[in-house]
């Protein structure tokens, strides 16, 4: 995941101006018709719609992409011969967090992933617990917003399996919020949560996940840009709204002005 940002020119203390979904839909009749088909609005509209033309562009881009992906196709998968010999370690290579360093020295034996919020049975999973869940291995391209891409093999537990270990989500669940050791967070909607390639990866290219690539566990969201693929996962929370996280836009990158939906 790319973590060194050239920040957009924004007021860091300001919350993005909200535009009501009713106002937006009235200005985009085609999208309004699409939503009348019975699809969830969350599938087509970001958690917060920004003002002006950029907000309309956000929704049109996301809704068009999601309509094309309505059958939940897989992202392209590659052959082992296409794996990059060197996968960039971008941004934070080794968190300085004291607890993380202690867990690292212990081989992550005491590491735990709390799963809380709108689930039937909140729980805390060890790395071994996650490795015992059904797994998936995929060879995919990581497309970074910084302008580079690289192919790697990832093995991990589908996010849906992790939620099922907690008894599944309860009524009202709309987003899964993932927090990291180094202070990043992202919310992803249920459309991406249920996709089979959305995994929590603990292996890379056949070996344990390297520190620089997010050990012991990272998110792989194969149909979105690299900045959505969080490293160094610390916790998972299922929620009905992103309003109480950061500036309410749905993730730290969109708080900074990037698109919440980073489809590729």
Model-derived regions: residue spans:
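N-terminal export leaders
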Residues: 19-36, 159, 219
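Structured, non-membrane catalytic/scaffold regions adjacent to prosthetic-group chemistry
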Residues: 42-264
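N-terminal secretory signal peptides
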Residues: 1-19, 30-34
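Intrinsically disordered, low-complexity regulatory segments
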Residues: 2, 19, 23, 42-47
């Amino acid at each position: 995941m790319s973590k060194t940002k050239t920040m957009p020119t924004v007021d860091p203390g300001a919350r993005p101006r909200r535009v009501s979904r009713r106002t937006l839909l009235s200005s985009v009749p085609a999208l309004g018709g699409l939503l009348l088909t019975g699809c969830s609005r969350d599938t087509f509209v970001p958690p917060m719609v920004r003002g002006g033309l950029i907000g309309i562009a956000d929704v049109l881009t996301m809704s068009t992409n999601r309509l094309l992906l309505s059958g939940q196709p897989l992202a392209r998968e590659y052959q082992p011969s296409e794996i990059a010999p060197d996968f960039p370690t971008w941004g934070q290579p080794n968190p300085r967090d004291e607890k993380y360093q202690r867990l690292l020295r212990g081989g992550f034996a005491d590491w735990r992933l709390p799963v809380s919020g709108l689930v039937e049975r909140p729980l805390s999973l060890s790395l071994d617990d996650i490795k015992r869940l059904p797994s998936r291995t995929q060879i995919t391209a990581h497309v970074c917003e910084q302008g580079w891409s690289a192919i790697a093999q990832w093995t991990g537990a589908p996010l849906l399996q992790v939620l099922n270990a907690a008894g599944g989500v309860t009524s009202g669940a709309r987003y899964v919020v993932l927090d990291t050791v180094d202070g990043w967070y992202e919310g992803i909607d249920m459309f991406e949560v249920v996709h089979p390639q959305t995994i929590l990866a603990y292996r890379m290219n056949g070996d344990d996940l390297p520190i620089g690539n997010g050990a012991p566990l990272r998110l792989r969201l194969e149909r979105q840009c690299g900045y959505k693929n969080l490293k160094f996962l610390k916790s998972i929370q299922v929620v009905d709204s992103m309003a109480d996280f950061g500036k309410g836009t749905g993730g730290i990158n969109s708080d900074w002005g990037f698109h919440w939906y980073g489809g590729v």
